Structures are given as structure tokens and as C-alpha cells.
Amino acid sequence: MANRREFLRECAGAAGLLFTGSAFGYAAPAGLQTAPPGKRWEVMVGGQRVRTIDLHTHVFAPEAAALLKDRSVEMLGHRVVQFESEETLRNLSVYNSEVRLASMNQRGIDMAVLSVNPLIYWPDPGLARQVSQITHEKLAALCAKHPDRLMGLGWVPLQHPALAAEVLEECVRKHKFPGVAVGGVVNKPGVAFEPLYELSDRALDPFWAKAEELGALVTIHPQKWIHPRWNEENGFDNIIGHPLEEALALSHLIFHGTLDRFPKLKILIVHAGGYLPAYVSRSDRYATGLSRNRPKRLPSEYLKELYYDALTFSNEGLRHLIAEVGLSQVVLGTDHGGGPATNRGWSHGAVDLILNAPFLSDADRRAILNGNATRLLRLET
């Protein structure tokens, strides 16, 4: 393992960040458009160059990983290790920024918004402060090195709500990040399926209030799922667990009043919003029959005020998402650096899907690839 360790250490030193997942450096699946190695795919729509913005990518700082290694929790008999030396070697790919930019060039991505992942909610306040500080310093330095290609979303310790609000403000004011990424639930350390906080919990109101005050983007991304009926071998933790957690998180925010208490929040839900947009009519029908805890509006109306990436993997999935939430709420997302470790082409094809969807006009394509994200991130046009 010595040579591999040396390679990882060298890359980490050059990058200052871990790019998580397995999606780097692999050839695209057959039939998808990419640039030749060393070249840049410049996406064109209707004869005009479009600066594509990817709002769903992953990153983590190795220095933060070092603080967390050898620490784990037990869930349903599984040892869940966010960062531990051997796990890191097996499950994390480390690349310097030049490798990432080359991969972006090949996939037709001009700007990537890097979200910190995995999302960890078990550290005590002191360790959480250390993790956030070093993560954000490294992320800010990387983005400053490539300001026209990379932006960052911070990590906040939601298990400590007051500290989370404080860290959020630092992310926006000090590091100039447009916002942060959060999980779909804050679980109790070592306890599966027993939340410390749902995102709608009143204890998190200081965080949501600060996000609304700052106009910060809050991206919701699932955490690792452990369940006796699925595991990493069959992929159900990802393909079922992730969209399910997103549907639950959104439902809590809607039915428990968070979106009413903070109506100006800017929330992006990755993976096309999970299962809820696909079957929100069921939630609408249920809500109309409630006598207590009834949302002020139909759930489908709240969905139209949130944002979603277009990572649906099919024309019909994208068409239905747009029909439910509106074209103005959909942005490009690739899950670059994430996705199942067994699926090497997971994040390829996101741009192709938008370019080739037969129901989209050129104006629609430009909106999803650039315009909606430009507005959401408050970028200069």
C-alpha cells in the first residue's frame, strides 16, 4: 500500500481537497458527446456559446478527513466510517484541480459549484468548528485559484444549530460562498432512523432565519443510508435511499411550516428533488383532507418556489419535473465526484440530456444550462 498512500498524499497536497466518489477519469458511455482528451467541449445552443454551470458536484478537504479518521458509529450492526485511513484509500479518489478541470472540459462543464460531502453531524462543537474552518479555508483557496471555473458551498454543523448559523454567515461573508449544503436529516450519532433534528425542527429555525437573511443558497443532499433491506452491494442505499430522503426532507419542510415561516429561502434539492415531484399529487390530495397541521397551500405550490437539478436520466423524467415545478426552477447538475462507485458513467450525459430533449426550445436549454443558475447564484451576466 505504500505506493498508493504516497500517490494519495501527493495528490492531496497538490489539491488541498478530496474529490469524492469514483467518477473521475473514466471514459464516457458510448453514444454520449464528450471532448477528446486534453480538449474542451464548448457547448453550443442555437449557434450560440453557452457557459454551462453545474450545481451538483462533490468535494472534501483531506485535512478535515484527518481530523475525523478512525472515528465511526454503529448503525444496525454496520460500522459506518466517514473517514478512516483504509476506508479513505478504498472509497475516496484524490485528484488535483487540474485533473478535475480536465474532466469538466471533457463533459462540457464551464463552472462547477463544489458542495462538501459527506455531510457529517456527529462531531462535538469543538471538532465541528475545526472541521468547518479547515474545510472552508481549503475550499476557498481552490475556488480563488480558478474563480471562473469553481465556486464553493460550505458545510454547517446542523447538530449545533447556533453554531450552524454562525458558520453559515462566515461562509457567505468571509469566504464569499453562495451558500451551503445540508443533509436531508440530522441523525443522532450512532442511531439509525432516529433523527436528532428533522430539517423542519424549530431548533433549526436560527439556521433558516440566517439563510433567509443572507439570501444564501441551501442545497439539500442525502446522507449515507443504512437499512436492513438494502445495502451498498445492491445499490438500494443510493438509488432508493437518496430520493426517499429528499422526499421526506421536503415533506417535513412543507407540512411542518418551515417554508411558511421563511418564505424567502433559496433551496436547491439535488437528484431532481427525489421522489416528491414525481408524485406530489398524492401529497396534495392528502393535505386537502387534513384538519390539523395542514399546510397553508398545496404541497405542489411550494415545489414551484424551490430549485432542482435536472439529473433525471431520461427525457420523460425531465419533462415531468418541469411540468410540476416550472422551467425556471431547474438547473444543470451532474453529481460529478459522486454517484455509485460501481457505475463509472454515472455523471456523464447530464448536458446531453438537456441538449437532446425534444420538448425543450433553445431558450429552455440556455435557461437550464446557464440562466437559472446565474440568477440563483447572483452571478454577473
Cite the ranges covered by each PLM segment.
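Catalytic metal-binding/acid-base residues of hydrolase active sites
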Residues: 58, 185-186, 223-224, 273, ...
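Active-site gating/metal-coordination segments in enzymes
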Residues: 110-249
